[in-house]
Amino acid sequence: MIALLGKMRKQMNGAVADAMRYYGKDYGLNYGVSLPTVRSIARSEEQDHEFALYLYSQQVRELKLAAMHIAKPELFNVEQASTWEQGLINSEIAEECAFAFLRHSYELKEIFHLWVEGENMFATYAALMAMARSQVLTKYEVETISAIVNCYPDSRPIAQGVVALLDAAYQHDELQSDVRSILASLSTSPTADYILDEMSWRIPETE
């Protein structure tokens, strides 16, 4: 860990750290290393799941993000879901979890339903974004959307995650009617209004 942290610290940039914008809590330590650089350094390391879990437990932004690339997605299962969920404190770490790690898990569907039914908004966000980029999206995931929006009526991350999932679902002919039904069922709220506005230009009115 010390060697990896040393590589990160060489790329420290206070201006970048000060300019960062994300939803949620701040990290304990933030060296301001850009995401592309964090990814590049992490990918140069050999995959080691136990080491990744150790990195993830540290209160350092760059180590938490690097853990997503050093961990082995095939070992990300329901039993470990709570461990990873606890570290999802903001939109940045949730997005990295979704794109680099969770979407490749063999148990994505099980983790998706576990996280969207939980109380961590950023875990729900990660689940939505990961499922949107997966090959296992079905009507059962689409059918969770109304409950998610009702649970988070004023959340921009959730709204963005829902749009990503519904947009992905609409690319499948067999799911288009399900997407339309969900959109028609949404009650007025900041989250729902954002979703409806974004989806309005993604779904042609003539269809």
List where the protein language model places each region.
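Alpha-helical scaffold domains
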Residues: M1-E207
